[in-house]
Amino acid sequence: MGMRMMFTVFLLVALATTVASFTLDRASNGRNAAADDKPSDWIALAIKQCCANPPCKHVNCR
């Protein structure tokens, strides 16, 4: 593999790493549209509502 090809591969890897890092950082920085409706948020909300209800709390919450 020639030097030019190795340099090109290096640049592609650096670009891919930068793009992946940027998108992961953006998703974890705040509450963007994709992160607002995660299933885990809905499950946590359902558990909180259930545990506020005494009959449900007695059966399902620990």
Curated annotation (Swiss-Prot):
Tissue: Expressed by the venom duct.
Assigned protein family: Belongs to the conotoxin A superfamily.
Domain description: The cysteine framework is I (CC-C-C). Alpha4/4 pattern.
Molecular function via GO: acetylcholine receptor inhibitor activity; ion channel regulator activity; toxin activity
UniProt keywords, alphabetically: Acetylcholine receptor inhibiting toxin, Disulfide bond, Ion channel impairing toxin, Neurotoxin, Postsynaptic neurotoxin, Pyrrolidone carboxylic acid, Secreted, Signal, Toxin
Propeptide: 22-48
Function, in words: Alpha-conotoxins bind to the nicotinic acetylcholine receptors (nAChR) and inhibit them. This synthetic peptide (10 uM) selectively, but weakly inhibits both rat neuronal alpha-3-beta-2/CHRNA3-CHRNB2 (63%) and alpha-3-beta-4/CHRNA3-CHRNB4 (37%) subtypes of nAChR.
Localization: Secreted
PTM annotation (Pyrrolidone carboxylic acid): residues: Q49
Signal peptide: 1-21
A Pfam family the protein falls into: Toxin_8
GO CC annotation, single: host cell postsynaptic membrane
Subcellular location, principal: secreted
Disulfide bonds: C50-C56, C51-C61
Protein name per the record: Alpha-conotoxin-like Qc1.2
The keyword Disulfide bond is assigned to this record: yes
